[in-house]
Regions:
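N-terminal, polar/charged subdomain of small-to-medium soluble alpha/beta proteins
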Residues: 1-99
């Protein structure tokens, strides 16, 4: 499985990139079925807040359906965790399709 981690309007450090890759590759259910995983972090300025809001979008591509989930938080890894939780719930669609 290819894992692509990128950022829009923000820098993704090597530490964050390696943590994301390790967590996605550790999921045995999807590792064999998914051909490509794309993780995009997007920084968004929020009016009245000195911090930037982060959005993490995870897209899993396979021969069948494309499964996508999004998470929002002020921290990259928290946003990734929220998106990964939503992805776990949606991965049933991918599992059922392969059967």
């Amino acid at each position: 499985m290819d894992v692509i981690v990128s950022g829009r309007h923000c820098h993704v450090s090597d530490d964050v990139r390696s943590q994301v890759e390790d967590r996605l590759l550790a999921v045995d259910k999807i590792r064999d079925r998914v051909t490509r995983a794309e993780v995009v972090f997007t920084a968004q300025n929020v009016k009245g807040s000195p911090d930037q809001a982060m959005t993490c979008e995870i897209t899993l591509r396979s021969r069948g359906p494309v499964v996508r989930a999004e998470g929002h938080a002020e921290d990259k890894m928290v946003a990734f965790d929220k998106a990964a939780d939503r992805l776990r719930r949606r991965s049933a669609a991918l599992t059922n399709w392969v059967r």
